Amino acid sequence: MNWGFLQGILSGVNKYSTALGRIWLSVVFIFRVLVYVVAAEEVWDDDQKDFICNTKQPGCPNVCYDEFFPVSHVRLWALQLILVTCPSLLVVMHVAYREERERKHRLKHGPNAPALYSNLSKKRGGLWWTYLLSLIFKAAVDSGFLYIFHCIYKDYDMPRVVACSVTPCPHTVDCYIARPTEKKVFTYFMVVTAAICILLNLSEVVYLVGKRCMEVFRPRRRKASRRHQLPDTCPPYVISKGGHPQDESVILTKAGMATVDAGVYP
């Protein structure tokens, strides 16, 4: 399988990612894609041919293999890696849409017209939601595939010998799996790396939401605090009634200073 196209997509989205997003890309490239291409495919190569049962009944090894391996590990992993990296393409497409919209705006209103976006790749507005939803989708895909693996292969185990009694086997036969320990190690490795990617995605979701909440509520708190603070140019005054009974003038007395006649206000 050619993974060059997938590598180009992930490399393009790397410049729009946060620090946690770049760590996720490194984990996907080094610990998942490379391990899959270099080692995992070789371990499961001709797996059905090496699945041997102690019977000469025609068709029995084939149905037993299908019973215990309904879907190959490597094919499930390939589908998982493709689906988990596709949301990154949405981010690249959204940025490309912004660039095209900005270009048309410049052509229509001239090169000196104010820009539609202060920073095309900055995660604001729709791009922020696209990036956030891509993280949630990637975490959901990895979680779903881990659940599928757990349902198909109990506890992600790889036994050395399995007992099969499926028709057309004449009786319960023992079937032997090729390189079970090596396959178990790779299975656990892929499960652990998928769990790490889920944790990184959820951490990035928390980071983005928390950062956005701070940007929204911090200016409001500053405005509220400024409203409750009295400026230094307006010191406190003591308000008292004047002594003239006809005009009821008001006397403003500042602490430590002479009284000021404020007059009568309608």
Curated annotation (Swiss-Prot):
Detected in cochlea (at protein level). Detected in cochlea. Expressed in skin. GO terms for molecular function: gap junction channel activity. One of its GO terms (biological process) is cell-cell signaling. The keyword Glycoprotein does not apply. It comes from the Eukaryota. Disulfide bonds join C53-C175, C60-C169, C64-C164. Keywords: Cell junction, Cell membrane, Disulfide bond, Gap junction, Membrane, Transmembrane, Transmembrane helix. Signal peptide: none annotated. The chain crosses the membrane at residues 21-40, 74-94, 131-151, 185-205. Residues 41-73, 152-184 are extracellular. Residues 14-20, 95-130, 206-266 are cytoplasmic. SMART domains: CNX, Connexin_CCC. GO terms for cellular component: connexin complex; nucleolus; nucleoplasm; plasma membrane. Pfam families: Connexin. It is a multi-pass membrane protein. InterPro entries: Connexin (IPR000500), Connexin-30.3 (IPR002270), Connexin_CCC (IPR019570), Connexin_CS (IPR017990), Connexin_N (IPR013092), Connexin_N_sf (IPR038359). Residues 2-13 dip into the membrane without crossing it. It is found in: Cell membrane; Cell junction, Gap junction. A hemichannel or connexon is composed of a hexamer of connexins. A functional gap junction is formed by the apposition of two hemichannels. Forms heteromeric channels with GJB2. Structural component of gap junctions. Gap junctions are dodecameric channels that connect the cytoplasm of adjoining cells. They are formed by the docking of two hexameric hemichannels, one from each cell membrane. Small molecules and ions diffuse from one cell to a neighboring cell via the central pore. Belongs to the connexin family. Beta-type (group I) subfamily. This is Gap junction beta-4 protein. The gene is Gjb4.
